[in-house]
């Protein structure tokens, strides 16, 4: 799991990777412990937006799609979140179940799912779903390949490319991992929401809602390059 905090200082975007072992988390992730750690860290940093790369909810039976949520169709995600317990491919099931549970735990701790687009610009705290591949595309950059397909030096090359586009400084830039860079690029949407003018923000999907004891649908929030017409206030 890659974690990265972002803030703005005098127009500069400052990013700092955070290693989970330093926060006391080791071994196989557990949703309750991870949610508690994320919330504690966010409160220490004074953050109000937390981005999670993973599905926040299951498919609505009435969305007109066979296998996926609306946001997944719009962004062409490789994994599809179907009705509760059903995923495509089936090997994604443990990850998706974990992600939905993580969002549930975050909501219990006071960090709910985003209810609508207007709420994004309020002063409220939210746990937001991200999709780093779409974040790269939204910035008109080629996505970072999957970890297994990323050649040596590619993470540093992509970080340099991102730094040429936006005013970013990264603590320990030479040691940034694949997952941390993915967390960084996804988190740029939060920087845009908080008023940084270097990029905008877009939402895919529809508002989340509860049905038969489980959450369905939801928004995926991504950064967007302002000079392409893709950015939305």
Language model: regions and residue ranges:
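RNase H-like (RuvC/DEDD) metal-dependent nuclease/polynucleotide-processing core
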Residues: 1-233
């Amino acid at each position: 799991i890659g974690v990265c905090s972002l803030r703005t200082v005098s127009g500069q975007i400052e990013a700092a990777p955070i290693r989970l072992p330093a926060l006391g988390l080791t071994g196989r992730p557990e949703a309750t412990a991870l949610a508690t750690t994320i919330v504690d860290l966010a409160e220490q940093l004074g953050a109000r937006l937390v981005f999670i790369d993973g599905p926040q909810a299951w498919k609505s039976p009435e969305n007109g799609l066979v296998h996926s949520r609306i946001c997944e169709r719009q962004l062409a995600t490789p994994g599809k979140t179907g009705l509760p317990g059903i995923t495509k491919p089936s090997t994604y099931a443990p990850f998706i179940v974990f992600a939905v549970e993580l969002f549930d735990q975050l909501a219990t701790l006071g960090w709910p799912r985003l209810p609508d687009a207007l709420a994004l610009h309020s002063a409220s705290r939210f746990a937001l779903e991200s999709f780093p591949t779409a974040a790269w595309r939204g910035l008109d950059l080629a996505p970072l390949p999957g970890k297994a397909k990323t050649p040596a030096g590619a993470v540093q090359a992509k970080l340099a490319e991102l730094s040429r586009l936006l005013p970013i400084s990264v603590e320990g830039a030479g040691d940034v991992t694949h997952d941390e860079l993915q967390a960084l690029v996804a988190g740029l949407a939060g920087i845009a929401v908080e008023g940084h003018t270097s990029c905008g923000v877009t939402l895919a999907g529809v508002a989340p809602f509860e049905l038969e004891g489980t959450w369905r649908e939801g928004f995926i929030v991504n950064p967007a390059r302002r000079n392409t017409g893709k950015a939305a206030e």
